[in-house]
Amino acid sequence: MVTQRKDFSEKEIEAVWEKATKQPNNTPDVFRKDYAGAWIRREDYGKRDMPYGWEIDHLKPLAKDGTHDFDNLYPVHWRNNESKGDDYPRWKTVLSSEENRNVESEKKWKVDE
């Protein structure tokens, strides 16, 4: 069982960024959306002090036998990652978007295993 966080390489960060959803009329190398619909900005990786900061989330948390495998990694706005924590297979996110801005919006998620 993997229990330790890891520092991701720039190559890994870029590969996970590619999983974020591209949006029409936006520069996909700069802005995309996470799975909850929150805007994230590429250069704000790891920056919790930025409005579009994002992190790499382990969909199935390491604390629940998740792995660092690419299929388990997702780009997520830091507030959604913080809200999710180690919750799995059910969790909630707290941020989505309306047009070009992020807004408070609680959504519940569930993975069928």
Where are these regions (language model features)?
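Short cysteine-rich loop/turn motifs with clustered Cys
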Residues: 6-54, 77
